[in-house]
C-alpha cells in the first residue's frame, strides 16, 4: 500500500501504546499523483495528474515481549511498514531502537516521458530509528524521533540530475499535553518534523518541514476522536532540467480518527475509522498532488 500521509502515521502512533493487538480493515484512496504507477502509463503532457481510485486492505499489528521489567522487544506493522525493535525504560525516560522496512513498491523508471508508455521499476526502502520519550511535567509528554533510511530504485532512465536513489533523514518532535482542568478527557497535540532527502541527483534532493496541531478527546465513555491539521513546505535543491525551475511545494493536511471501544459490548475489540486529506501545491503543475483516504478497521487486543 502506498504511503498515505505522515499525519496518519503520527495519529496511529498515539494508539501504539496499546500493546499486543491486531487490526484488520479496508478502504479506498482517491489521489492525483503523476509519480504514482496507478496513473496512466502514457501521458500526452506534463500537466496536472488525473483522478485515480484505489481499494486497499489494512493489516496492522503490534506484539511485544517483555524480557525484563524495563525492556520489551517487539514487532509491529503500521500502514505497510514493518518494524522490529527494542524499548527500554530508564531513570531519564524511555528509549526505542529499531529497524523499519516497507513491503516494496513500484514507481516509474522515468515519470517525465510523454507520448510513450512509461515503464515501472521496483523500489525498496529500509532504515532504522531511535526514539527518546520523556516528560517535562506531569501533564506533558515528549517523543523525540530520529529516523534514517535508504531508498533504492532497480532501474532509472532519468537524467543524472534527476536520479532518485538516496538517503532520508527525519527528525520529529511529538508533544502531547493533557490539562488537569479537562479531567483527562482531552489532550492537545503539537508535532514538528524536518526531512532531508539526499538523492543522487540534486534536482531530486529536497528539504521539507511540517507543523501539525491537533486534539484527541473522549466523546463518550467508549468513543474517542482525534483530529490533526498540518501545514508545511518542501523545496528541492536544484533547478529541474525538465521544467527549467526549482520546484517548491506548499503542503496542507487534515486527518481524523474515530475510535469505538468495545463495540456492541464485545470485550477486547475496538473499531476505528480513519479519514484524511493532503494536498501538495507546487509551482510546477506536474508536482501537484492530492490524496484523500478512508479506512475502516476492526481491532483485537490480546
Annotated model-derived regions:
Residues 69-73, 92-97, 136-144, 180-188, ...:
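Repeated loop/turn-to-beta-strand initiation elements of outer-membrane beta-barrel proteins
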Residues 61, 260-262, 274, 289-302:
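Outer-membrane beta-barrel "beta-signal"
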Residues 53-59, 80-84, 122-128, 165-171, ...:
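Residues that define the transmembrane beta-barrel architecture of outer-membrane proteins
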Residues 21-27, 62, 74-78, 98-102, ...:
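Transmembrane beta-strands of outer-membrane beta-barrel proteins
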Residues 29-33, 70, 80-82, 104-108, ...:
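Sequence/structural signature of outer-membrane beta-barrel proteins
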Amino acid at each position: 500500500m502506498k504511503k498515505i500521509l505522515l499525519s496518519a502515521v503520527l495519529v496511529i502512533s498515539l494508539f501504539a501504546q496499546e500493546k499486543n493487538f491486531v487490526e484488520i480493515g479496508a478502504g479506498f484512496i482517491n489521489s492525483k499523483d503523476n509519480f504514482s504507477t496507478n496513473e496512466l502509463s502514457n501521458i500526452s503532457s506534463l500537466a496536472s495528474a488525473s483522478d485515480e481510485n484505489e481499494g486497499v486492505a489494512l493489516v496492522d499489528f503490534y506484539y511485544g515481549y517483555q524480557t525484563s521489567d524495563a525492556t520489551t522487544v517487539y514487532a509491529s506493522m503500521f500502514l505497510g511498514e514493518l518494524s522490529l525493535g527494542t524499548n527500554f525504560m530508564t531513570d531519564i525516560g524511555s528509549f526505542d531502537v529499531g529497524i523499519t522496512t516497507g513491503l516494496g513498491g513500484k514507481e516509474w523508471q522515468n515519470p517525465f516521458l510523454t507520448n510513450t508508455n512509461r515503464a515501472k521499476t521496483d523500489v525498496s526502502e529500509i532504515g532504522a530509528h531511535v526514539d527518546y520519550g520523556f516528560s517535562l511535567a506531569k501533564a506533558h509528554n515528549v517523543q523525540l524521533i530520529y529516523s534514517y533510511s535508504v531508498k533504492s530504485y532497480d532501474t532509472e532512465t532519468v537524467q543524472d540530475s534527476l536520479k532518485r536513489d538516496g538517503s532520508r533523514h527525519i527528525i520529529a518532535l511529538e508533544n502531547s499535553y493533557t490539562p488537569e482542568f479537562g479531567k483527562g478527557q482531552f489532550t492537545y497535540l503539537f508535532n514538528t518534523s524536518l526531512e532531508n532527502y539526499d538523492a543522487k541527483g540534486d534536482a531530486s534532493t529536497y528539504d521539507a518541514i511540517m507543523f501539525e496541531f491537533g486534539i484527541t478527546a473522549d466523546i463518550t465513555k467508549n468513543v474517542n476522536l482525534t483530529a490533526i491539521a498540518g501545514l508545511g513546505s518542501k523545496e528541492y535543491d536544484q533547478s529541474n532540467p525538465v521544467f527549467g525551475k526549482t520546484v517548491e511545494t506548499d503542503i496542507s493536511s487534515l486527518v481524523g480518527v474515530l475510535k469505538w471501544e468495545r463495540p456492541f459490548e464485545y470485550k477486547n475489540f475496538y473499531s476505528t475509522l480513519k479519514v484524511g486529506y493532503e494536498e501538495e501545491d507546487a509551482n510546477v503543475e506536474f508536482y501537484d498532488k492530492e490524496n484523500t483516504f478512508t479506512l475502516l478497521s476492526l481491532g483485537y487486543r490480546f
